[in-house]
Regions:
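N-terminal and secondary-structure boundary signal
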Residues: 2-302
Length: 302
């Protein structure tokens, strides 16, 4: 029987596995190398979510790096499923609440949380605990209707050439992506890049037209100022809805490079980052860096 790898050993192997991109066309490899600047991730460990979140924001330079006074903050959480917080189908309501409180304290004019759900939205918002958390902290969680969407062109898209996107996402002064990390039957994993499907009107098109490519295509267009991945608990199987087998990394992952963020999060599932189609494609397209040997990862204990 093969000995179980430590987290450090697994990440080391994932770094070595980055050599797999050599099978990509030369011009695409060159684009990826040239456009992927050295990314930095802060991985905060602990069990006290408010303390973990405050620590991560401080490491990222504080709210002055992201917010302007009276600006519109749009927080893209995962609130798609009518499941309980402990089941890991949605972003932790405690994390959502803490982020909204921080934004309000830092001077945000409003904090909006649009989410096109998979389960009926009233049930999803209530059962996930996110509706109550958002209301307590001064945020507005809502299910977008047809009138809330605007059609946009995805100029660098390969499979996805246009999309109807929630207008508030397009108009945000500060756009924050706060997904939960979990398994997914179609995309293998859903982390930050996949999370944007909850901000578009027709997610079915993505599923029918090369899902991994569409996920990467949309990330050529959408540029959040901050990404915070909820990896306090992760759903290893039966995602995205669950229930499934759970693990408890007790981590929050902070960054601005969606490809680097997702590549690191993939290792929590003992996956090589480039075994995930949309991570490999996004790296090749130059959206960010999925090669963990080129990413600065700072671990912080709280």
């Amino acid at each position: 029987m093969q000995a179980k790898l430590t987290r450090r050993q697994f990440i080391a192997r994932a770094v070595a596995g980055a050599a797999g991109v050599v099978c990509l066309p030369k011009f695409i490899r060159a684009q990826a190398v040239e456009s992927a600047a050295k990314a930095t991730l802060y991985v905060v460990h602990g069990k006290d979510i408010p303390k973990m979140f405050s620590t991560g924001i401080a490491k990222m330079g504080g709210w002055k790096s992201f917010l302007k006074k009276d600006g519109k903050v749009v927080l893209k959480v995962n609130a798609a499923w009518a499941s309980l917080p402990e089941q890991g189908g949605n972003t932790s309501p405690a994390l959502v609440e803490e982020c909204i409180r921080h934004c309000r304290a830092a001077g945000a004019g409003e904090v909006l949380l649009p989410e096109k759900t998979c389960s009926p939205f009233k049930e999803s918002f209530k059962r996930s605990g996110i509706a109550e958390a958002a209301a307590r902290a001064g945020g507005k969680l809502y299910s977008p209707e047809k009138r809330h969407f605007r059609n946009v062109e995805i100029r660098q898209g390969v499979s996805l050439k246009q999309a109807e996107v929630v207008g508030d996402v397009l108009d945000a002064d500060c756009l924050i992506n706060m997904p939960v990390a979990k398994s997914h039957g179609g995309a293998t994993l859903t982390i930050s890049m996949k999370n944007w499907m909850g901000s578009v009107n027709d997610r079915g098109y993505w599923h029918r037209n090369n899902l991994h490519q569409c996920i990467a295509d949309f990330s050529t267009f959408i540029k959040p100022k901050l990404i915070v991945v909820d990896a306090t608990r992760i759903m290893l199987t039966n995602g995205p809805q669950g229930p499934g087998k759970m693990a408890y990394p007790n981590q929050l992952i902070f960054g601005t490079d969606p490809v680097a963020v997702d590549a690191y999060a993939a290792t929590l599932f003992e996956k090589q980052p480039f075994s995930i189609g949309h991570i490999k494609i996004a790296h090749a397209m130059g959206i960010g860096c999925g090669d963990l040997s080129q990413v600065k990862i700072e671990h912080v204990n709280t």
